[in-house]
Amino acid sequence: MTLDDRWLAAVWPFVQDQLPPAPAAVLEIGCGTLGGFVPALGDAGYRAVGVDPDAPEGPDYRRVEFERCQPPWPVDGVVASLALHHVADLDQALDRLRDLLVPGGTLVVVEWAWERLDEATARWGFARLAPPARGAEPGWLHRHRERWSASGRPWDRYLRDWAEAEGVHPGEQVLAGLDARFTRRFHAEHPYLFSGLAATSEAEEQAAIDAGLIRAVGTRYAATRAEPAG
């Protein structure tokens, strides 16, 4: 099982629990090259389409930015997993999410907040990194470890500079934008680093969070589109 497979398997129960029952129509934005949750959604009886410029080929995917996607049916649920923190225009993207959903439709968001990744949390993750597989691209934690070491800067400054250069939105900004457009139903901070650590489980990361050794960097959120007034 790849790290991406582990991540999808770990998050899928939350996603499924928050969505309306099948056969609801679900759109996943930012499904990536592997197709995200679309296969699991289909297996669970949902009508599902994944949207991403790098999506797989096939009838269940659209290779386009979600801001320009025209769903084939009214959308009962939208899933956005690690898709919002790097959009070019956050307000425009969130407005589009709201417009995609039918009134009363469900939005499920899985994200991370870079501003909560303090030095202690980063070092905890770095210490648990395995060497990259031969021929494989280094993971995101590997890249941060090497770039931070090469920068010679304090961790907080390095991370702020990276986020600014990459246009990564703070988790608090994403959350505020969501709450301004949707009726929040659920929000919690969750483990996130395990997604890049082959030998560390979500439960082990949660134990370190509970012990106060590290901070929870992940975010899980669910909300509904408010019914129109009147």
Which residues fall in each region the model found?
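Substrate-binding/catalytic lobe of Class I Rossmann-like enzymes that use SAM or dcSAM, i.e.
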Residues: 138-200
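Class I SAM-dependent methyltransferase SAM/SAH-binding core
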Residues: 32-68
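Conserved class I S-adenosyl-L-methionine
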Residues: 23-32, 108-144
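C-terminal lobe and adjacent flexible extensions of AdoMet/dcAdoMet transferase-like proteins
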Residues: 181-230
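Conserved alpha-helix/loop element of class I SAM-dependent methyltransferases that forms part
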Residues: 4-23
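A conserved beta-strand element that flanks and buttresses the S-adenosyl-L-methionine
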Residues: 79
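A short glycine-rich, Lys/Arg-flanked "PGG" loop and its adjoining helix->strand segment in the class I
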Residues: 92-103
